[in-house]
Regions:
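Membrane-embedded alpha-helical modules
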Residues: 146-149, 153, 160, 165
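Transmembrane alpha-helical segments of integral membrane proteins
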Residues: 162-175
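Short, amphipathic, aromatic/basic-enriched membrane-interface segments that mark the entry/exit
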Residues: 18-19, 39-43, 123, 151-156
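Transmembrane alpha-helix interface/packing and boundary motifs in multi-pass membrane proteins
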Residues: 30-52, 193
Length: 212
């Protein structure tokens, strides 16, 4: 319940962090983005809504420089995916063969299928899809994708993801109608983010049922 409250009221919690920790807010946000993208067992952290809220608070409070914020979180996202890639390269194949309560194998399989269809561009697309952005670099590592290719997609994906959400938050986060309905907006961002995954899962289920 606490996690759900944090996600839906992420702006209030970030404002509290800014008040209590000041400049350390950069380190807190860096750590959250790094952990979400870097550890395959932590796909539930609120990346999209967090970035939007951070951009909005950078505009409204002046406590964070948007350029510094964007640069640091870009680095966090790149390093996180890089760590996840190497974890996948080291233990990935074994994860597909065993049952684990820490890693949802179905998410891994779905991401692998997405890779088969879209190739390296999956690293870019997955940045905007919760769960997929955590599993994509892991699957890339497990599939032994060439690191140079992975890094190029990683850099592009991180730039697009971090840049777009922080910019949108900075521009629109303090528009009165947005500010007054921030919780609803965050909920909307979450729904839109997970919608592609839901559609893909539903299509796969229907296709499987038809084939049988």
């Amino acid at each position: 319940m606490e996690l759900i409250d944090f996600i839906l009221h992420v702006d209030d919690h970030l404002l509290e962090f800014i008040t209590n920790y000041g400049v350390w807010i950069y380190a807190i946000l860096f750590l959250i983005i790094f952990v979400e993208t870097g550890l395959v067992v932590m796909p539930f952290l609120p990346g999209d809504s967090l970035l939007f809220a951070a951009g909005a608070l950078a505009a409204s409070t002046g406590a964070m420089n948007p350029w510094t914020l964007g640069a640091l979180l870009f680095i966090a996202a790149v390093l996180g995916d890089t760590l996840n890639y190497h974890i996948g390269r080291y233990i990935g194949p074994r994860v597909f063969e065993i049952e684990s309560r820490f890693i949802n194998k179905q998410h891994l399989i779905n991401t692998q299928k997405f890779f088969e269809k879209h190739g390296g561009k999956t690293i870019i697309f997955a940045r905007f899809i919760p769960f997929a952005r955590t599993f994509a670099p892991f699957v890339a590592g497990a599939g032994k994708m060439d690191y140079k290719f992975f890094l190029s997609y990683n850099l592009i994906g991180a730039f697009c993801w971090i840049g777009s959400f922080i910019t949108l938050g900075y521009i629109f986060g303090n528009v009165p109608v947005v500010k007054d309905n921030f919780t609803h907006l965050i909920f909307g961002i979450i729904i839109i983010s997970i919608l592609p995954g839901i559609i893909g899962f539903t299509r796969a289920k229907l296709k499987k049922k038809i084939n049988h």
